[in-house]
């Protein structure tokens, strides 16, 4: 869920959006992460989407890598990533560069997210798989999570991507409730199509943990949120993240509401009652935030976790 805290917007944010900058050892890890990313000519969703958690996550030596280019073929009204109808072809060197960066950072778990590539016949699936395979070949003990596009509904491409690929978590974000999807997401996306991709992933690989994310504060109602939860559970989604939507700038979908931490807690409890194995819920939670910890929580016992960054 990409965000950008502009100077103008930052003065209007509630107090619970304060973020600490890294110091000491955390600052050194932040710099090392910066070097590993830049040194391997990689992109991260942390940077491209202006994530507010970048200092915390990079200060812990973790990052979410974004593959298949810096530009997305879709223009969603919530997202800061640049839109381009025909981006450059995926870099064939990227899979190895990704593996090198994961090795340099000493990661035990890597989250790989993607841009939409509607310009490619398979939606980018072959390149996404090459990236996963390269990391696994170099570092077979590293856990892998893929935050995937909807592949334009191409289930054959999804099968080619998932069959036999070394992966622990398959994630795809519905982003918002069904009613708001046409306002918030690119016209080529739909709530139903996202559900179909999540369902198909579970059918292809029943052992995979599936995950999705919803932004709050776009104008959704409580009933619509509950309906979205139920729809995700109906297709077998097990992990859920909930976070506050923050507009990247003028011209994007407006923020309709700042959701309080207490309401995030209440929604997490509701989600838990519906059967999600683990939930990360809080104003600054993003879909890949502390992903390894969320998976570990789900594998140990059902929990509800509110992950929030405050000063």
Q: Where in this protein do the model-derived segments appear?
A:
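Short pre-active-site segment immediately N-terminal to redox-active cysteine/selenocysteine motifs
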Residues: 68-75
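Conserved glycine-rich "GG(E/T)P / GGGxP" loop and the immediately following alpha-helix
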Residues: 110-129, 219-224
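A short acidic, helix-capping loop that chelates divalent metal ions and anchors anionic groups
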Residues: 116-121, 178-184, 248-254
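Acidic/histidine-rich catalytic cores of soluble enzymes
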Residues: 152, 170-191
């Amino acid at each position: 869920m990409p965000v950008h805290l502009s100077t103008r917007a930052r003065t209007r944010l509630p107090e619970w959006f304060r973020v600490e900058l890294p110091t000491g050892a955390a600052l050194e890890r932040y710099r090392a992460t910066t070097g590993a990313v830049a040194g391997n000519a990689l992109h991260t969703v942390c940077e491209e989407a202006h994530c507010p958690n970048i200092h915390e996550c990079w200060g812990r030596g973790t990052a979410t890598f974004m593959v298949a280019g810096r530009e997305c073929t879709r223009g969603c009204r919530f997202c800061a990533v640049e839109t381009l109808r025909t981006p450059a072809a995926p870099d064939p060197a990227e899979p190895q560069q990704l593996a090198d960066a994961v090795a340099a950072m000493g990661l035990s778990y890597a989250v790989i997210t993607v841009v939409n590539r509607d310009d490619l016949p398979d939606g980018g699936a072959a390149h996404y798989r090459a990236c996963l395979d390269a990391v696994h070949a170099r570092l077979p003990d590293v856990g892998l999570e893929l935050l995937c596009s909807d592949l334009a509904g191409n289930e054959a491409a999804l099968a080619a991507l998932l069959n036999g690929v070394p992966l622990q978590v398959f994630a795809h974000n519905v982003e918002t409730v069904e009613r708001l999807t046409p306002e918030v997401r690119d016209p080529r996306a739909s709530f139903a199509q996202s559900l179909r991709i999540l369902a198909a992933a579970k059918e292809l690989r029943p052992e995979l943990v599936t995950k999705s994310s919803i932004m709050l504060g776009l104008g959704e109602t409580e009933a619509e949120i509950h309906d979205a939860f139920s729809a995700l559970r109906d297709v077998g989604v097990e992990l859920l993240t909930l976070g506050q939507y923050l507009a990247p700038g003028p011209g994007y979908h407006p923020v309709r509401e700042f959701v309080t931490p207490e309401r995030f807690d209440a929604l997490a409890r509701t989600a838990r009652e519906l059967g999600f194995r683990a939930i990360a819920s809080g104003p600054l939670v993003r879909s890949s935030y502390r992903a390894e910890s969320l998976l570990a929580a789900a594998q140990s016992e059902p929990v509800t976790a509110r992950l929030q960054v405050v000063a």
